[in-house]
């Protein structure tokens, strides 16, 4: 989440060390200036960094140092999140809002194909827990349908679970989700 880390990744790769690098969504969207609000929704681990670090992370995405964008989905119970900043448990949920939150900014900096790679194929391929998904006529569909030019306001109803600790709550996102296909079945947040 800080610029110096990308320098370490680049140096390791120059030495032939097989290292991967991901950056989470919220460190690309926010910098530490929002911490002045003392809003516990911004209490994240690792913590939000300076604007210069955020821009360095974006540069790392553009030059290929960053291999994937992660969601860093960390649910926190309401009673642990809706307290004073210093008493709150760090974390934020993001699965339901990651794509519409980041798509416009990401595709203004990289191609659509690179954005899809960073948000889907690369995280699946790099994760030890997930297979790298393929698309084919005989395979079950795992797709997310995005309306890239249709804004939406994030509300607690957008989250599938009972937890809605997100710095995006109440914010207008530049894109919105239509729904998804999971194992070939159509899903919306209402029936996920």
Predicted regions and their residues:
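Residue-level signal for pocket-adjacent positions within structured domains
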Residues: 23, 39, 43, 80, ...
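His/Asp/Glu-enriched, well-ordered alpha-helical/loop segment
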Residues: 41, 68-69, 74-148
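A short acidic, glycine-rich active-site loop
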Residues: 42-53, 89-93, 166-173
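Histidine/acidic residue-rich metal-binding segments in metalloenzymes
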Residues: 1-69
């Amino acid at each position: 989440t800080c610029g110096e880390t990308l320098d370490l990744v680049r140096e390791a790769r120059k030495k032939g060390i097989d290292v991967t690098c991901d950056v989470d969504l919220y460190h690309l969207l926010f910098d530490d200036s929002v911490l002045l609000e003392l809003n516990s929704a911004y209490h994240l681990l690792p913590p939000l960094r300076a604007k210069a670090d955020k821009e360095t992370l974006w540069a790392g995405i553009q030059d290929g140092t960053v291999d994937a964008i992660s969601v860093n989905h960390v649910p926190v119970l309401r009673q642990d999140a809706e307290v004073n900043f210093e008493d709150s448990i760090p974390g934020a949920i993001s699965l339901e809002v990651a794509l519409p939150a980041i798509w416009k900014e990401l595709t203004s900096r990289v191609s659509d194909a690179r954005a899809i790679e960073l948000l889907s194929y690369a995280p699946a391929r790099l994760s030890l827990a997930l297979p790298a998904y393929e698309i084919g006529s005989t395979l079950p569909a795992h797709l997310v349908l995005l309306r890239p030019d249709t804004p939406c306001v994030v509300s607690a109803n957008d989250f599938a679970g009972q937890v809605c600790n997100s710095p995006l709550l109440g914010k207008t996102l530049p894109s919105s989700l239509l729904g998804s296909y999971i194992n070939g079945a159509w899903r919306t947040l209402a029936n996920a």
